[in-house]
Amino acid sequence: MGKLKIVSKLSNIHSGEILEEEFLKPMSFTAYRLSQAIGIPQTKTSQILKGKRRITADTALMLSKFFGTSTKFWLGLQNEFDIEAECNNIKKKLELIQTWN
């Protein structure tokens, strides 16, 4: 029999980290350059990249237009992050809730 492989859970990844690592870095784009291209303040872009600000619907629309992705892609990344973070915040409370049958 094979050995059991223990897989550790990945940390909750903010949408800003994905924006930076998967889109900006490969394009050699800075927060400033992206901000200029999509018409939002550079401080807003920097806060998103640092995980201090959410990607909102308006920003998702601009990012999707610029990168040729869907708005749902960006909002989905943000929602997954938010749900996992909140699940961790209220984990004990959730454990007390009985599933209704």
Annotate each PLM feature.
Residues M1-V7, N101:
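Intrinsically disordered, low-complexity and often Lys/Arg-enriched segments
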Residues K5-S28, G76:
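A short, Lys/Arg-rich alpha-helix, primarily the initiator
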Residues L24, S35, S64:
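The alpha-helix within a helix-turn-helix
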Residues S28-Q47:
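Short alpha-helical DNA-recognition segment
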Residues K52-K65:
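Short, basic-rich loop-to-helix N-cap that marks the start of a DNA-contacting helix
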Residues L75-N101:
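Short, charged recognition helix plus adjacent turn
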